[in-house]
């Protein structure tokens, strides 16, 4: 697994400058990790709308890694790592994402909370709030 240069740079933009609300990463067939998409912090103005857009951007039948910058209480933000592995994803892809997860996380310093999600209920705002609190 090789991280494209944009992977770390985009994460640093989220962590240091808070430019992005979320980042979705994809492992390509050549085992290179790329930034598939990111959502800007003030995309729609409302936090709930931005979260919904992020959640709906996760593919229903493919694995992904995602980073989510969440703040339920002003000034108390958490950077969450999400290992997205829907039950309908191909077994080979699930194995690839599972076996590279720890190495990927080590490349991105500053992750505070980790989630493994197989459907959107695993990473609903309520589920995230319960886990963080």
Curated annotation (Swiss-Prot):
One of its GO terms (cellular component) is cytosol. Keywords: Actin-binding, Cytoplasm, Cytoskeleton. CDD domains: ADF_cofilin_like. It comes from the Eukaryota. It is found in: Cytoplasm, Cytoskeleton. Its main location: cytoplasm. GO terms for biological process: actin filament depolymerization. Residues 1-133 form the ADF-H domain. GO terms for molecular function: actin binding. It holds the Pfam family Cofilin_ADF. Belongs to the actin-binding proteins ADF family. Actin-depolymerizing protein. Severs actin filaments (F-actin) and binds to actin monomers. This is Putative actin-depolymerizing factor 11.
């Amino acid at each position: 697994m090789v991280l494209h240069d944009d992977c770390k740079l985009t994460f640093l933009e989220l962590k240091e400058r808070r430019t992005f609300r979320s980042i979705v990463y994809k492992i390509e067939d050549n085992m290179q990790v790329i930034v598939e998409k990111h959502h800007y912090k003030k995309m729609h103005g409302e936090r709930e709308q931005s979260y919904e857009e992020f959640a709906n951007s996760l593919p229903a039948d493919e694995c992904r890694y995602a980073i989510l910058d969440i703040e339920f209480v002003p000034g108390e933000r958490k950077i969450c790592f999400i290992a997205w592995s829907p039950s309908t994803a191909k077994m080979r892809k699930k194995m690839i994402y599972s076996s590279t997860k720890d190495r990927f996380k080590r490349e991105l310093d500053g992750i505070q909370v980790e989630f493994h999600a197989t459907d959107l209920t695993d990473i609903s705002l309520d589920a995230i709030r319960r886990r963080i609190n």
